[in-house]
């Protein structure tokens, strides 16, 4: 069973939508940033400060290679995962890419008080617009995109469910049996 991979800019709701979608589909949920934090033993913000963005992106790429195999997961990715074409190819090999988007002002309202966003320093509103401009078109790799600023969480999940059903991504009797996140294979760096 293919993974359902949520992509989009920070603050578009990937984790919230992913968690809800996983519960409805009775599939394991994996947040790539949380998994990288678990493996590194420190928060993303500290990885960026102490080890640099290059190290974080390297860990992210390694995780994407592990996700190239369909495992029936719902995966919330970090906002910059699509900047590496190899990540996109690996994620697409194992699943269907669903995009989440929102207006810059909606994103600002969602992330402005969060201290855990390493790419948001200084004028947060301006930085969001700058990053969105830099990433213009990067999220177009999604097969289907929902504007989470225009829809409630339940409506967003419902629209994704409709798309998955229409495209045949939801197979009868393919729900996760264990309910936990399957062990990802160890891939040599």
UniProtKB/Swiss-Prot annotation:
Gene3D superfamilies: P-loop containing nucleotide triphosphate hydrolases (3.40.50.300)
Cofactor-binding details, from the entry: Binds 1 Mg(2+) ion per subunit.
Known role: Catalyzes the specific phosphorylation of the 3-hydroxyl group of shikimic acid using ATP as a cosubstrate.
GO CC, any one term: cytosol
Residues the record lists as binding Mg(2+): 15
UniProt keywords, alphabetically: Amino-acid biosynthesis, Aromatic amino acid biosynthesis, ATP-binding, Cytoplasm, Kinase, Magnesium, Metal-binding, Nucleotide-binding, Transferase
Binding-site residues, substrate: 33, 57, 79, 135
Protein name: Shikimate kinase
InterPro entries per record: P-loop_NTPase (IPR027417), Shikimate/glucono_kinase (IPR031322), Shikimate_kinase/TSH1 (IPR000623)
UniProt entry tagged with the keyword Metal-binding: yes
Xref: Pfam families: SKI
Pathway given in the UniProt record: Metabolic intermediate biosynthesis; chorismate biosynthesis; chorismate from D-erythrose 4-phosphate and phosphoenolpyruvate: step 5/7
Catalysis performed (reactions): shikimate + ATP = 3-phosphoshikimate + ADP + H(+)
One example of a Gene Ontology biological process annotation: chorismate biosynthetic process
Residues involved in ATP binding: 11-16, 117
Localization: Cytoplasm
Family under the similarity heading: Belongs to the shikimate kinase family.
This enzyme's EC code(s): 2.7.1.71
Disulphide bonds in the chain: none
